[in-house]
Amino acid sequence: MYRELIGELIKNNDWAQLQEPCPERDIDKAEKYVGYTFPDELKALLRETDGDRWFLLSVKEIIENVERNRNIMAEYFEPDEFLEKVDRHIFFATNGCGDYYCYRILPNGETDTAAIYLWEHELFETHAVAENMTDLIVKYYGGEI
């Protein structure tokens, strides 16, 4: 489903390239490293393409992003503030300008799947930009976000 959708949307894009499907063991590894269970739609996307080298991150890039955030950004915040503003998110796509598309993690540890959010790195704030993964992909490659 996602592979066909993205393939159609990027056919005139010289930079985006669908990748091979992500092995299940790598998705499991990423979930463990991030510390949160990925929503079903994110897992489904990764099972079809492990990123697109443009907008969608691979599981390796997801892990590297979390590692970078924990090693660099954590020192600038109190622990609770870091958890709330940075670490309580699942970042899986980028706009190329330092901001990330993500799911928020609620204080009870559950993933907020009511929307997909844009995390703004200058303000450490999020706002909803899409209803679901399909909506996000269509909006991004359609130039709406």
Question: What kind of region is each of these model predictions?
Answer:
Residues 96-97, 110, 138-145:
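A broadly tuned preference for mixed-charge, low-complexity surface segments
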Residues 125-135, 139-142:
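Compact, glycine/acidic-enriched structural inserts
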Residues 1-101, 144:
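A surface-exposed partner-binding patch
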Residues 54-56, 60, 108-110, 119, ...:
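Generic alpha-helical propensity signal that fires on short helical segments
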Residues 32, 67, 105, 114, ...:
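A ubiquitous, low-specificity "background" feature that marks scattered single residues
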Residues 37, 49, 94, 111-113, ...:
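Residue-identity detector for threonine
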